């Protein structure tokens, strides 16, 4: 069996809150680095299919989520080394308290699987 090695540059996608560096997005998994500017946030949103996990590599973040059983909103501070798993259907939002980076691993990503609950800095203007 021949082993194929693929070396490539990540795809950088500018966002209102910073940028996404797509490491890989294939039928099995997706890996990204989310680079945030201080004070910026992405939309409160959820995915029906995607299951994702974040690792805070740099900076600190205000993490907001909604309990879908009670409709209660919650928030917590995330610091370097914290890990959060977002299961499908869980509304969530990140806001950068300072410049920061989050490594995200997930199942395959499709833009059509993002459902916005509240606007973020990428939807303003």
Where is each model-derived feature located?
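Double-stranded beta-helix
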Residues: 3-9, 13-14, 70, 95-125
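Short, surface-exposed secondary-structure edge patches
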Residues: 33, 53, 74-76
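Short beta-strand His + acidic residue motifs that chelate non-heme Fe in jelly-roll/DSBH
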Residues: 43-45, 63-65, 86, 91-97, ...
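Short acidic-glycine-tyrosine-enriched beta hairpin
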Residues: 67-89
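Glycine- and acidic-residue-biased ligand/ion/polar-headgroup-sensing regions
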Residues: 49-68
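ATP/adenylate-binding site constellation spanning eukaryotic-like Ser/Thr protein kinases
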Residues: 39, 58, 99
